Amino acid sequence: MAEEIDDNEFYRENFSADSDWEVFNAQLGEILQKWDVSSDSETRNLKSEEIFSCNWKVEREKLDMLRNGIEVEYHQAILEDEELVRAEAKEITCLQRTSCHHDLMSTGNSFGPPIRSSQELHILARIYGLRRFIVLHPVNPTLNYMRSTSEFNFFLSAVAVVSAEVQSLVPIFVQIYDPKWNYYTGVALAPALRTNFRLIGLEKAPPECRFLMGLLTLFREKVPTSYTQAAMISVCTTYALDTMRIRMPMYVPFDHGLSSEDIVVDGEVSHLEVQQFCALPHGYKPESRTEIYLVYTWPELSEHVAFDSEQRSDFVPAKAPLGKIYLSVEASSYLSCCLRDYQSVAEVTRSLESFVGRNFSGTSSGAEAASNPLDRITEHKLTKRRERSFELPSQAGLTKRLPGPMTESELSELLAYLFPDMHPEMALFPYAKKNFTDKFDPMRIKSAVPDSLVCRLSCLLATCHAHLGSVEGMAQVWAAFTRQLRLLWDNSLMVPGISAGFPDTRTCLLHQKLQMLNVCVERRVQREANSKRKSEGMVGKASSEEEEDEDDDEGEFFDCDDLTAGAGSPTKAVLSLKPEGRLRRLNNERLLEEPDEYLYIPDTQEPVPKTEDQLQDDAEVMLKLGPGSGLTTQMMCTSLLSDMEAFKAANPRGIMEDFIRWYSPKDWEEVTDELGQVKHQLSIRMTTEGNTWQKVWEQAQAVPVSRQKRLFDDTNEALKVLHYLETRKMHEIYNLTVIPLLHSAILKLADILSNAELEDLFSSQIEKLLSDLCRLSRSHSDELPSIKPLLDDLAELERRFYQFKCFERLSGYPKRSSLQQVKLQFEEILRNDNCCTIVNRRLTAAGDGTLYDILIPKLEEDMADRLISKDYIIRLDGDTKTTEKGLYLGPQFMRAIVTGEKLRLCGAFTESTAFV
């Protein structure tokens, strides 16, 4: 039986098992050592209000304790790197003073703004002014918070023991009770000193504890050691003025009964004015408001100087040395809401046909013809069929109502805004006659010219999505837009509101597509004009039908296939030495092998325009084919082959060197031989074996431009553009229009600020928005980056504008103050986090035309009813000079926040741990 016993499975009792408390201590100790809490390098004094303006770094670790675990957070202020001032360095002579002691005694960080502008600032930093501290709390504090005294003692004792073991100089707090109460208990250790932190709250405090006299008595009772010097006090009182509302009613372009006037809200009505019409809404929601607080501060007083009790108080606004006004704005703009709503379209993957049905363009020669390239081979006399379809399209198809929430009259009004020339009876906003490039820098934002067709369309789509039918209304407008484009093409009319010239790849893709459509219309009109001009000059005896066919051959390019494009017919072969297609002579240059003949510049085909996506597709194809592929050479040299064939037709006796002299003069180099004679020869890249130029020259035959195959088929390219626009899905339409939309929104806001004469006040914010949009528009990623940060900045600027209008009214403009005075003080609000100084007796006396003079009538009234809180801080610091034994007694700190009958006490009392 004994032989069957396995020693490995034999049970052994572990007598060294640790308790939960010891395990927790070990885990917490490892975390504190990793954070290096025993060092105290940052011992310089804090600047005034530095705690409230600096950035914070928060590190988190999780421990498996108390059901769902305990989270340990290390909060640390990121201070500017500055060397200690000499006078300050001399002051720091006691090794027992830590940064925690300095922070508790710092009067410059006693009171922060009454409005929490940043959620990152922890309440312990606001109450005690600490630059770094550690907090322990349950992982889900709202569900599993600490309730019992045993839990408090468990963690607080662990914190005290671990702090002593690792020699931590950072205060450590434990959050207790419900998190919304903000109750903490904590401890901070220093050599021979221990500071105990306690936070409590009373719903109804004793009357004597709501004033300074009673609080001083309570403070003296809590101080563990007797101090000979007087305590220093800091006091802050906060008053709330009436909430200010300014109604800026909603304005929606092409408003059909939309208005916010049915919501009755008290407040002054102020309509926003703009110089340039933009199809985007503006105004602010009725619930927008600005809350105004007056904060008076007594930064540092001796306890024997001031008196404060139920009977009499010295802490009244008229006696305050420092007074500030804070403006808390909650404003929501219809413009920002419209842009945020438009973001949702990025997630809509439905096709346009699912909203408006198939064949919404109203003609059968649309997307279907372009989408089936086999028709070009199987159909006979395709060119003539196209010519017949280019005449007036079917009016029944074009006037067919598009499905959607808008009526025909409403849709016609929107189309009149986009195409004013096509609806002269309804056009209210014609396009500017001056050059579109005057107001737009394409090197910056990859958008379109302001108030161009692209910008108007983008704004209309966003407005329709927000106010005129959601996604269905947006799809209806886009379908009507593409149908109008097809109507313009079928009638050989230029698209209005688009920059002239080839597709500019510095602009957005939608603008490039419309530029391409205009180029196609221009080429088509030019080609048809040339054909008509030649047909009128023809004299012959052939029948009318034969004359028409012959005119087509002379006036238009042949749609021949690639194999026979260069050769032509036998009667037009390169063997003929009759020059054709000459444009003009190249100065007095002569052919190298025929000095008696001049060198002529041939009539060549115009360059082939391409949009950005086409260039990208070509690059991808050539990358896949590789550099050695013949197709790659053919793609790159199509235009070169056409020019060489035209040159040979114009100069039958010319050689490649003659062509290079005209086409690429830099490759015709001047050299000096051994005898000192100057000669010319081709460059090295032209004479390299297997040179592409030589191959193409050998392949090229003498074919004038009139008989060459067209490099650019304007008909096919126009149908491609129309097909592209008609087959976009909703999220693709969003990607095409979001950058011009944001660009127009920023310019609209700049226009509003300019009309209010505030462009100088907010110029830096506008410039930042444009710079951010520039980076966003030129992102190289396949997916558009998130526009949320830009929308947040835009909404913040709109809130600032609403805040200024309220501050302008508060300042008594225009009767009691000038606009320049209001702007000067509002600049301080922008710099100081919604705060403006109205009283500063340290620097100047009150008055002198400041906001204080305007608020005097309000201050002379009884302000007691407007008092919302009183904040008292009592400090007592014992240095080595105040005790007989030369011991540092440490800081004593108590803060009392009185709000009506409620009282919150926050104490930090230091005791000695040395045995004397």
Swiss-Prot record:
Residues 530-574 are annotated as: Disordered. It comes from the Eukaryota. GO terms for cellular component: cytoplasm; endoplasmic reticulum tubular network; postsynapse; protein-containing complex. The keyword Ligase does not apply. The modification Phosphoserine is found at residues 543-544. Residues 545-562 have a biased composition (Acidic residues). This is Rab3 GTPase-activating protein catalytic subunit. The lineage of its organism: Eukaryota, Metazoa, Ecdysozoa, Arthropoda, Hexapoda. The gene is Rab3GAP1.
